Structure formats: structure tokens, C-alpha cells
A protein has these predicted regions:
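Extended low-complexity acidic/polar segments
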Residues: 131-176
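Solvent-exposed, glycine/polar-rich loop segments of beta-barrel outer-membrane systems
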Residues: 21, 134-148, 188-198
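Gram-negative (and chloroplast) outer-membrane scaffold detector with strong preference
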Residues: 49-141, 208-219
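Residues that define the transmembrane beta-barrel architecture of outer-membrane proteins
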Residues: 28-32, 42-46, 68, 89-97, ...
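Predominantly the C-terminal beta-signal and adjacent terminal strand-loop region
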Residues: 160-219
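N-terminal targeting signals for Sec/Tat export/insertion, comprising classic cleavable signal peptides
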Residues: 33-56
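Cleavable N-terminal export/targeting peptides
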Residues: 1-29, 219
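Extracellular loop and loop/strand-boundary signature of outer-membrane beta-barrel proteins
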Residues: 33-36, 79-88, 144-150, 197-203
């Protein structure tokens, strides 16, 4: 966690506790949302989330979803073999426990109101990965396939979102920034085929970051 992240959480958490001590209980304690993220490392992510608000400004919950590369960045290959084209782009499914820390209303527009929020969490991917390798003859024609799999490598990562939400009655939307500690090649780096470690073909680890949009319903 970087310093900015900790400062934002401390600030909003302090506001939340102060405001909660002076606010009336809300009947809208549950929030469901559909979320879409576009990240660096050429990846997109979609998930569905649920949070239960133990007070108006603190929600506990999580999400389930998947992420995938939309453009391959490094393709393991060698003499007489290459990773099958259907497995060039890295992907995985995940569950994502998280805490939603929401500020009191910071501005209003008609019947709608704006809030700031921070949402720290941990992404837990399926701790298993497999790919098919295409076997080639001297002319580059396919002569068969072999499966390579592993359960080694880091399959989890901490992340956080910082954003702005607009709520009208029970409906709303959010936009903001997301930062993750996920290494999208974390599992594949440990794969070996024909004596060659896949890690040599992938770029150095970079923490993905980008933007997100969410549509939610309160009840």
C-alpha cells in the first residue's frame, strides 16, 4: 500500500465514523453493482459485487468476476512449438473480498448527490493455470498439441479503487481510478516446456492500474 492510499483511507474512514455518529440509520443497507475496468498491461475486467453497509458509510462484501488480456504481450515459443493462439492472452476468474468506505454527501445536483469513496480489497484468482502448446513440423504445420499446467505462482493481490459516485434515489453510477498489485503472468512464469521457462518470454512485472465504471442499486 502506498502513502496516498493510506491517507485516503484514513481521511474517508475518519469522516465516515464522525458522520455516522451524527446520522440517522439508513434503510438502504445493501448495494449490488456491475463493474467494468480497463487496465494497463492490456487487460479488461468485469465483475458483479455486493456490499452490506453496517453503517451508512462502511460496507462489507465483495465481488466475483474475470479479467483477460485483449492483446498478447509475449508469446512463449521455440523450435517446433508455440503456445496455441487460443491461449496467447492471459485470463483468470476471481473472487474479491473488499471494504467500501464512503464519504458523506459532498455536493448535490437536483435530487442526486455525490460521494467520494475508497474500496480496498484482495483479488483471489483460481490458483491453477493451463495452456496448450502447438507442435510444429519443419514447415510450420501443426502436428499435435500438448498441455502444460501449473499450480505454482502468486495467485492473489491487494488492490484499491478511489472514485466518485452519483446517486439518484436507489440507483447510481461511479467512476474512478483502480490500482492493483496483480502480476497477470504470475502463474505462467513458472511453466516449463522443452526445457524453457515461460518467464523468459514475458515482460517484467508491472502493477496494473487504470479506470473503472460501475452501475449500482441500493435496497
Amino acid at each position: 500500500m502506498n502513502r496516498m492510499y493510506l491517507l485516503c483511507i484514513t481521511f474517508i474512514l475518519g469522516i465516515a465514523f464522525f458522520a455516522n455518529a451524527q446520522s440517522k440509520p439508513s434503510e438502504l443497507k445493501r448495494k449490488i453493482a456491475l463493474n467494468g475496468e480497463l487496465l494497463s498491461c492490456d487487460t479488461w475486467q468485469v465483475d458483479a459485487s455486493f456490499h452490506y453497509f453496517v453503517c451508512p458509510y462502511i460496507g462489507l462484501g465483495g465481488s466475483i468476476g474475470m479479467w483477460k488480456q485483449y492483446m498478447a504481450d509475449g508469446i512463449p515459443s521455440g523450435r517446433g512449438w508455440t503456445v496455441d493462439e487460443d491461449h496467447e492472452n492471459v485470463e483468470n476468474f476471481f473472487i474479491h473480498p473488499s471494504i467500501s468506505l464512503v464519504s458523506p454527501c459532498i455536493a448535490k445536483i437536483g435530487e442526486g448527490h455525490f460521494n467520494l469513496f475508497v474500496e480496498p480489497g484482495i483479488m483471489m484468482n483460481i490458483p491453477y493455470c493451463n495452456v496448450f502448446v502447438t507442435l510444429l513440423d519443419d514447415r510450420g504445420s501443426t502436428i499435435g498439441y500438448k498441455k502444460v499446467s501449473t499450480n505454482k505462482g502468486r495467485w492473489y493481490a491487494f488492490d484499491y479503487k478511489i472514485g466518485l459516485s452519483l446517486t439518484y434515489d436507489q440507483f447510481g453510477c461511479s467512476i474512478g481510478y483502480i490500482h492493483s498489485g496483480l502480476d497477470i503472468f504470475g502463474m505462467r512464469r513458472n511453466m516449463i516446456f522443452d526445457g524453457k521457462l515461460f518467464n523468459a518470454y514475458y515482460p517484467e512485472r508491472k502493477n496494473p492500474h487504470g479506470c473503472f465504471v460501475s452501475f449500482f442499486y441500493l435496497f
